[in-house]
Amino acid sequence: DLDLQRSDLVVNVVETFEALIRLERQIRSAEASFQRMDKLYRLTQARERQGRASRVDTLRVELKRGQALSRLESDRERFSFTQRDFAELLGQSPETTFALEPPPLLEIELPAPESAIATALSNRLDYAQAWQDYDDTIRGVKIAEKALLPAVSLVTRYERVNDDSTVDEEEDRWSVGLAGDTDLARTRERAQLGQATISRESAQETVRIHELGIAREVRQLMTAYQQARAELLIAERNYTLAENRARLARRLFEIGRGDNFSVTDAEEALHDADLRRLSARADASVTGYKLLRGLGTLVESP
């Protein structure tokens, strides 16, 4: 149980650490987004005074600017809460701050599913415990079967016998017999054997359920890891496209060939693409550690 808790703790630490990394990057992104929206707002105000933009245009950009500021404040608050949780996980003071450095993603060479399942069955402590419980029930059945045997003991007797007709002659007599209890039905022992047999069958079924569950879990974890890495590539590509679109929209607006609607739409798309990219990066990291936990290789066991 302690080793299983250690593996869960490692994954929990990784999840919280990746959440901190993601939130820290979100804050940087939100700060840059707010600065761009603030610049757009001031530029739209100037155009409104020149008669090149309507009041509706200015109010719309002002609303987007306020939303960008709200997201920034929300990200900062979430980062503060998550940092306290991370400090407590590490046994540090809740006020501890950390200099965060994103680690490289785990590069796991995926084996064939059957090989991965075999690895998990060889290393998973919960599966080993199920087998240990089954072995204990087998010993329990053997003990119950032995107790069912009648309690028989060998009895010997020796005596010297004098024959009254011949005073000088004595005879040695030996007798051998078997003694046992009178409860031939062995009712209590039979009940104990029946209970031990049921326990053995139940433990055997538990082993089978564990084996099927581990096989299903390993396949799901491998699929999740592959999907997370693929989604990260897609998210990074989409972010690059959204970034290029937002840059172009801002440039066109600045030279008078575009409107602020195009800019704000592009900024919203960039914000969404950035969130997906950061979430995909965190998922790609966490799924790697979860896969190692599922294989039983995340933490070495003594």
Indicate residue ranges for each PLM-predicted region.
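Small/polar, glycine/serine/threonine/aspartate-rich low-complexity segments that form flexible
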Residues: L100-P113, K142, K146, V155-Q192, ...
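C-terminal structured "cap/appendage" subdomains that terminate the fold
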Residues: R245-D283
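Periplasmic alpha-helical coiled-coil/stalk elements that build and connect Gram-negative outer-membrane
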Residues: L2, R6-T119, A224, A228, ...
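Sec/SRP-type N-terminal targeting helices
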Residues: D1-R6, E31-A32, V56, R60, ...
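Acidic, low-complexity, intrinsically disordered peripheral segments
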Residues: L106, E211, D274-P302
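Bacterial Sec-pathway N-terminal export signals of envelope proteins
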Residues: D3, P94, L100-D135, T197, ...
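Long amphipathic alpha-helical coiled-coil segments
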Residues: A87-S93, D136, I143, Y289-S301
